[in-house]
Amino acid sequence: MHPDQKKTFKEKNDIRKKLFNSTKEERLDWRKMKDEKKRKNEEKIIKEAEEAKKAKIEKVDHTPPFTISIAVPGQFLNNAQSAELRTYMAGQIARAATLYRVDEIIIYDESCRMTDEAVNAYYNGTWQGNLIPAETNYEGCFYLAKILEYLECPQYLRKDLFPIQKPLKNAGLLNPLDAQHHLKYDEKTLRFREGVVLKKRSKDGRGPICNIGLEKEFEIDSDAVQLPPYTRVTVEIKNLTEQCKLYRGSITSGATVTRETGLYWGYSVRLMTGLQKVLQAKKFDIVAGVSPRGKLASQMDVCILNKPKILLVFGGVAGVDAAVESEELAEWRRAEDAFDVLIRTTSLSNGSRSERVEENVLSVLAQVQCHLETLNAL
């Protein structure tokens, strides 16, 4: 017999002798210990099964089967008859983008006068928005970008992220987006939230402190994450239901939230100096121009199995053809050559002699998404 087997046999034999020679009270204690051990084993098995089930659920990919982005010229705001109407037109774009889960809104300069230096000035905060959008400038692009960014941002972050500026003067009159990532003060059903890094010193070995719109502040787990104050972040809270001084967790991304929960986590805004830059990005599987000469949106050929990324390009008041023709240095001269496909919204002629960009965006998004959802259901 192997020495280990002898040892095991001896231990078991000693336990038996002790049990048989024990009193009635001692035997009852042994029985309680045995029942307690059995109960703990059962609890352990149940807990492991629940954790395995939870992990399986979390691994399900809820990413949508397709992604839609749009490109619009900022100059369409020049037609607004007042500052209030200008803000309202931008708000219509934001509402349409949120309703139909647009991933990105690209704002391009239809006149091709915008420079990279002007775009950099907008992003580094030196642009103030003091000029009124007009045909002689490209301020409409910056106005549109600022209003779209403001509306997409959760209300509790706006005070820290958006200083008082002329483009936002009438933003309070707009209908709220009420997007799925615009969580309320007392809403604790979701472990993900948007936050902003505060100008506060954290303890050694711990990360920055953030405002996430709850009654307590949020602390990032790791001090390896170095973020400047007033940086917007998406966070995952690890101790949401616990009684603690601060919420704690890690930084994540909107794409991760969508993949794990299926929720729409807002759109991003990007400025481009011209339509040519938009088309040269090669970021999308299908680039569709919106034109009255195109085919119906329901006839657009799409392979839904590849989770396509689709860009819908809208023109200004003169249409997408005028935007293409204004690109003097481009290798194409016609809209048919610039885009993979041209689409329109209806087989009938419009009842109105003019098309407004904000109305066109809403109708095209509705029809394209309906077409893609139909293909996905097949």
From Swiss-Prot:
Q: Which GO terms describe its biological process?
A: methylation
The record's InterPro entries line, in alphabetical order, gives: Alpha/beta_knot_MTases (IPR029028), NA-bd_OB-fold (IPR012340), Put_MeTrfase-C9orf114-like (IPR003750), tRNA_m1G_MTases_N (IPR029026)
Enzyme kind, highest EC tier: transferase
Pfam families found in the cross-reference section: Methyltrn_RNA_3
Q: Where in the cell is it found?
A: Cytoplasm, Cytoskeleton, Spindle; Chromosome, Centromere, Kinetochore; Cytoplasm, Cytoskeleton, Microtubule organizing center, Centrosome
The molecular function GO annotations come to: methyltransferase activity
Keyword list, A-Z: Centromere, Chromosome, Cytoplasm, Cytoskeleton, Kinetochore, Methyltransferase, Transferase
Coiled coil (residue ranges): none
The question of whether Acyltransferase is a record keyword is answered with no
A single Gene Ontology CC term: centrosome
- EC code(s) of this entry: 2.1.1.-
Q: What does this protein do?
A: Required for association of the centrosomes with the poles of the bipolar mitotic spindle during metaphase.
The record's similarity note reads: Belongs to the class IV-like SAM-binding methyltransferase superfamily.
Protein's UniProt name = Putative methyltransferase spot-1
Gene giving rise to this polypeptide? spot-1
